[in-house]
A protein has these predicted regions:
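Short beta-edge/loop segments at beta->alpha junctions of small alpha/beta modules
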Residues: 1-71
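Nucleic-acid-binding surface
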Residues: 18-19, 52-202
Length: 202
């Protein structure tokens, strides 16, 4: 049974019980418990699994973040690190979602999701890394996501304390940033963007 299961589900880097039921309409979920004890599978969170033969790479973690809480896309600190904006690595997968804010502590790391308004769920793209495809905020959108939900970024000094890479920030498409900014319709965000601009070109 397991060999057949593995052959079919190997097409899914991360699979849900719903994925399993589509492939195996009559499936005893007790098998999942048994296979975990045999170290064939690892449960990420309720209803989501991956095979223990999987190599845990960055692309896999990004893909997993999208899969286990959908709709969502990689954003905030994780995306800033991906684009080289922040100097240090991150130890938690951070995403934007239109669902409620939550966090999952799993055997492969922490996955944090921050709620944004449904009308702000845009500005992401699909890219490939380590053979995995996933949704990640565009550079301009991750900047706005970050500023929108961080009230403390209210001065040039607050950005200086973050040590964001100015040379990478200069790669921002400022026309796109401005267009996206209008969709937020937030005076507070506009002020934070102004502080960011002063920081970049100080």
């Amino acid at each position: 049974m397991y060999i057949r299961f593995q052959q079919i589900m190997a097409f899914f880097p991360v699979f849900s019980t719903s994925d399993i039921e589509k492939a195996f309409p009559i499936f005893d979920k007790k098998a999942l418990v048994y296979w975990q004890k045999k170290h064939y599978l690892t449960k990420i969170r309720n209803g989501y699994y991956f095979f223990n033969t999987t190599q845990i790479e960055e692309g896999f973690l990004f893909f997993t973040a999208n899969k286990i809480y959908n709709p969502s896309y990689i954003s905030f600190e994780c995306a800033l690190s991906f684009y080289g904006i922040i100097p240090e690595g991150v130890f938690m997968m951070t995403s934007a979602t239109s669902l409620k804010t939550t966090i999952f502590n799993t055997q492969i790391g922490k996955f944090q999701y921050k709620k944004i308004k449904s009308n702000l769920f845009f500005g992401y793209k699909i890219i490939n890394l380590d053979k995995y495809s996933f949704k990640i905020a565009e550079l301009e959108k991750v900047i706005l996501d970050m500023l929108y939900l961080n009230e403390s970024l209210d001065s040039i000094e607050s950005f200086e304390s973050l040590r964001w890479n100015k040379e990478e920030l200069k790669k921002i498409n400022f026309e796109k940033l401005s267009n996206y900014q209008l969709l937020f319709n937030s005076n507070a965000l506009n002020k934070r963007v102004n502080h960011l601009m002063k920081y970049i070109y100080a």
